[in-house]
Amino acid sequence: MAHVRHFRTLVSGFYFWEAALLLSLVATKETDSARSRSAPMSPSDFLDKLMGRTSGYDARIRPNFKGPPVNVTCNIFINSFGSIAETTMDYRVNIFLRQKWNDPRLAYSEYPDDSLDLDPSMLDSIWKPDLFFANEKGANFHEVTTDNKLLRIFKNGNVLYSIRLTLTLSCPMDLKNFPMDVQTCIMQLESFGYTMNDLIFEWQDEAPVQVAEGLTLPQFLLKEEKDLRYCTKHYNTGKFTCIEVRFHLERQMGYYLIQMYIPSLLIVILSWVSFWINMDAAPARVALGITTVLTMTTQSSGSRASLPKVSYVKAIDIWMAVCLLFVFSALLEYAAVNFVSRQHKELLRFRRKRKNKTEAFALEKFYRFSDMDDEVRESRFSFTAYGMGPCLQAKDGMTPKGPNHPVQVMPKSPDEMRKVFIDRAKKIDTISRACFPLAFLIFNIFYWVIYKILRHEDIHQQQD
């Protein structure tokens, strides 16, 4: 009996310790579960659960697959705007491109933060819009000191993707009013592979295009108003979403005023100095005329060096052509003055030749009339003898006229002739002193009114 009682005691003790151990294990599990509920999930575990291999997320498939298209809201912040080249017709810009869309697969509630800023390397793990710049000629990413990219995920599944880019974009220019022109350069954002059934781009409602404070351009004034438009593209492969922004750039002509207009104006005025130089100073006037013509030609060539070879006439071409015409006309004016002033020599030479011919002709005529007078006398005597004298008289009581001898004006002396032609040449110089500046002033009035006022207003009306 003692042995049985001892055995029962051992069995009851065993069950007691087993129950105690079981209770301790249950308490430990409850404590661990309570701790797990109170302690947040680690970021690594959360990301693995959200977009890891075990999450079932596939970056190759767009959100809302086989459903409504994904709406991507775009925003651009311009850091710098410059390097506008007329020869290649493009411009260079540095921007922050920001895209926002909703991916329901990335919505979460397990993590306490409202948003997560992820490393750029995570971009390969999620779906992204296939945006590209339709009028892009060259582009660069920025990797100093690290990739200039931002990825932010919000609780409701919204995704913000920002990237810094330097772009060279084409900008077809109309240079008819150069350098008083206003250019419109566009930036087109388009989907490369997704049609509008899958993806739609749209501008952000508030401040879709922002410009860095204090941004200035060396030759242009970037206007505050920017046109935001939709430019949906239709190709053989489908209809693709496209949005664009138009930048209006008004050229500041201060550089061209100093480098082109004022120097050419001074060259034209310098060519008028020859009108005040004595006409006998041929070397001085010819040298001045040729120098101004060559300088004007060089100036005209320089104005076209930085411009493309276009088929139409630009405003600067008209200015340079008219200035060259005035300078060349001033040189021709001296040629006319010199020609007129030397005409008395030619006239004297012509008179000498004519005088010699006239004297020879007069002698011949004198001898001819002498022979005729002798014959007439003989005839008169013979007719009178037969009573026919009155027949030699004219009818109606008119007497016959003798040979015509017009009254000849005495020719002027060589000095008088020289003075007449020199006065004519001086008169040409005197008229040129007034006519050339007046004609150039009239041209300036028409030129600046047409290009700076009338055409400028037409351009603004077209843009509005």
UniProtKB/Swiss-Prot annotation:
Signal sequence range: 1-33
Sugar attachment sites: N71
PROSITE patterns recorded: NEUROTR_ION_CHANNEL
Keyword Cell inner membrane on entry: no
Processing and modification events after translation: Phosphorylated by PKA; this causes down-regulation of channel activity.
Expression sites by tissue: Widely distributed throughout the central nervous system.
Positions of modified residues (Phosphoserine): S370, S379
Molecular-function annotations in GO: extracellularly glycine-gated chloride channel activity; glycine binding; glycine-gated chloride ion channel activity; metal ion binding; transmembrane signaling receptor activity
Site feature Important for obstruction of the ion pore in the closed conformation, where: L294
Catalytic activity: chloride(in) = chloride(out)
Keyword Cell membrane: yes
Listed Pfam families: Neur_chan_LBD (PF02931), Neur_chan_memb (PF02932)
CDD domains xref list: LGIC_ECD_GlyR_alpha (cd19009), LGIC_TM_GlyR_alpha (cd19060)
Regions crossing the membrane: 256-277, 283-303, 315-335, 431-451
Positions annotated to bind strychnine: Y235, N236, T237, G238, K239, F240
Protein family membership: Belongs to the ligand-gated ion channel (TC 1.A.9) family. Glycine receptor (TC 1.A.9.3) subfamily. GLRA3 sub-subfamily.
Record-linked PANTHER family: NEUROTRANSMITTER GATED ION CHANNEL
Extra information: The alpha subunit binds strychnine.
Protein name per its UniProtKB record: Glycine receptor subunit alpha-3
Species of the source: Homo sapiens
Gene this protein is translated from: GLRA3
